[in-house]
Amino acid sequence: MKDRVVLAYSGGLDTTVAISWIAKERNAEVVCVSIDLGQGGEDMETVRQRALGAGAVESIVVDARDEFANDYCLPTIKANGMYMKEYPLVSAISRPLIVKHMADAAKEHGGTAVAHGCTGKGNDQVRFEVGFANTAPDLEIIAPVRDYAWTREKAIAFAEENGIPIEQSKSSPFSIDQNVWGRAVETGFLEDLWNAPTKDVYAYTEDPGLGQAPDEVIISFESGVPVAIDGKKVTVLEAIEELNRRAGAQGVGRLDMVEDRLVGIKSREIYEAPGAITLIRAHEALEAVTVERELARYKRGIDAEWSNQVYDGLWFSPLKRSLDAFIDSTQAHVTGDIRLVLHAGSITVNGRRSGKSLYDFNLATYDEGDSFDQSMARGFVELHGLSSKIAAKRDLAN
């Protein structure tokens, strides 16, 4: 009986060619796993049939949209997850979910190995392989693109030589990864840092300069979870999809950044994440109202480390699990409504309300009704600056 290899199948050129290559080079049967993460585009049944046409003995499609939203996007919202303060971890949070379902498929279908189509330059090889090391350490890992130095030209030539049906051509300029949380675009002419993105780079967002009327939206949260938009109850997935549509129509969520990859190189990336960025900005605004000052300050550092852990492929690490527990504990009072305006590529918060708010109007106002006892301030200022005052006195004496 032949060994079985479970392949993470995207439907693209590299993983389509990998089916035949693994079957020939490893004398193995290939089981393809494709995950619906709300990426849109090609119908998943078309993707499944392509895998079978390329030689897979089985092709499995998993509808993981709600799971992705609830178990991967939602923790990112609670952690205000932004790598390098910009990137909302579009690809990074999807990889551990793919790993989970591939490990399940290997167990169910008798797989002895798993395979992916990642290159040796990217972060995803780490995310996949460290993920498997944590969830299914006995599985062999096959990485033909990386380990056999595949190029696009070599993959196309192999497909033509072996009669593999592919629709992709050498004219496709970009490498694209997308899901409901966002879209990542790289390579092609974008590798020259001076080249500005052209209109065809974007798909999730409209041109911010088109002059649409502003869109005002109210996002409601309960314990850090988005539960309603403009008063209408939504699931997490529905919240992301609705804000992808509305924020995307306003050109919100475009990023053009040079990113520090885990492997040590810098890479230019174009991202579109209208729903993700809108939800994170709204969540940050509500935390500013409901989370105590010292806790909020400390959480910002935890959020940054959480983002680093996830970006670096350590979703399953003990540290990341501990960070999850801390972050969840901070969300008990993050309940309320944030009103914001989406317009011309920008997000402007213009309203906040919460029954858990720490904002006290009578303490904050400078007008009549002020209940803040300003006589306490003098002593507070003296004590607050005492240690630095003593140090300054010493330094001046020397």
UniProtKB/Swiss-Prot annotation:
Transmembrane domains' residue ranges: none
Catalysis: reaction(s): L-citrulline + L-aspartate + ATP = 2-(N(omega)-L-arginino)succinate + AMP + diphosphate + H(+)
Keywords, alphabetical: Amino-acid biosynthesis, Arginine biosynthesis, ATP-binding, Cytoplasm, Ligase, Nucleotide-binding
GO molecular function: argininosuccinate synthase activity; ATP binding
Gene Ontology biological-process annotations: argininosuccinate metabolic process; L-arginine biosynthetic process; urea cycle
Record: residues binding L-aspartate: T119, N123, D124
EC numbers, comma separated: 6.3.4.5
Residues that coordinate or bind ATP: A8, Y9, S10, G11, G12, L13, D14, T15, T16, G117
Presence of the UniProt keyword Ligase in the record: yes
Disulphide bond pairs: none
Pfam families: Arginosuc_syn_C, Arginosuc_synth
Annotated positions binding L-citrulline: Y87, N123, R127, S175, E259, Y271
GO CC field: cytoplasm
Pathway in which the depicted protein is active: Amino-acid biosynthesis; L-arginine biosynthesis; L-arginine from L-ornithine and carbamoyl phosphate: step 2/3
Subcellular location: Cytoplasm
HAMAP family linked to this entry: Arg_succ_synth_type1 (MF_00005)
NCBIfam families: argG (TIGR00032), PRK00509.1 (NF001770)
Family: Belongs to the argininosuccinate synthase family. Type 1 subfamily.
Subunit structure as annotated in this protein's UniProt entry: Homotetramer.
Name assigned to this protein: Argininosuccinate synthase
Organism whose genome encodes this protein: Corynebacterium jeikeium (strain K411)
